[in-house]
Regions:
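Hydrophobic alpha-helical transmembrane bundles of multi-pass membrane proteins
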Residues: 1-149
């Protein structure tokens, strides 16, 4: 679900927030993700735009998917779809802009190797917040700690 909801959301809005020219906090949305709309200044040497876009799309979906384990069995499907939409639209692109898109954290010299912060920390923090809001899996475990199947 994360990939089905997140891909069009990230391509239409999220990519611009993450890599569009803007300020240190968020980029400017310049239309659907394409080299014609955003240029090639953010591309690593020799990497075609579409390869970069797919790579970033998978990172966005990974960040959203990390949360599914923390929220499994405790959320309605429609609620999870709304969450997936919002993390792909706002949360991941803004934090990604700060770290990889020329935002204020990257301007301070921060380097994120392979998405440990931009992808995994964002997903982990969102999962932690979701688990706190949802509370324990009531009825899942007995008083002795064994699983009630």
């Amino acid at each position: 679900m994360d990939f089905c909801i997140g891909t069009p959301t990230f391509w239409i809005v999220g990519f611009g927030i993450m890599f569009g020219a803007g300020n240190g906090f968020f980029g400017r949305i310049g239309g659907i993700a394409s080299e014609a709309n955003y240029g090639s200044s953010m591309l690593p040497n020799g990497v075609p735009f579409w390869a970069f876009l797919i790579f970033q799309t998978v990172f966005c979906a990974t960040s959203a998917t990390i949360v599914s384990g923390a929220m499994a069995e405790r959320t309605k499907f429609s609620s999870y779809c709304i969450y997936s939409f919002l993390i792909s639209l706002i949360v991941y692109p803004i934090s990604g802009h700060w770290i990889w898109g020329g935002g204020f954290i990257s301007q301070m010299g921060f380097h994120d190797f392979a998405g440990s912060c931009a992808v995994h920390m964002v997903g982990g923090v969102a999962a932690f917040i979701g688990a706190i809001i949802l509370g324990p899996r009531i009825g899942k475990y007995g008083k002795n700690g064994k699983v009630n199947a």
